[in-house]
């Protein structure tokens, strides 16, 4: 089952910051899609790796229309 991933403008804007350097939209979609189950409230998920090797966290929540990625936090 594939989940629709919605990335907020805030999260897209943060990708341009230094701490999120080399984290791509595809990395975020892959990370959000890999989380099993339902996320009823905004929750931080830690320890994802981008293709470039950068470690990052995401804050996500499930909506009726898909999985909303609220922000990205680079390490």
Sequence positions of predicted segments:
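Ribonuclease/tRNase effector modules and their secretory precursors
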Residues: 1-75
């Amino acid at each position: 089952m594939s989940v629709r991933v919605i990335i907020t403008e805030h999260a897209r804007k943060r990708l341009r910051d230094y701490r999120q350097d080399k984290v791509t939209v595809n990395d975020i979609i892959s990370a959000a899609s890999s989380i099993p189950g339902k996320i009823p409230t905004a929750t931080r998920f830690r320890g994802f790796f981008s293709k470039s090797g950068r470690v990052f966290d995401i804050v996500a929540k499930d909506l009726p229309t898909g999985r909303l990625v609220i922000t990205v936090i680079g390490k």
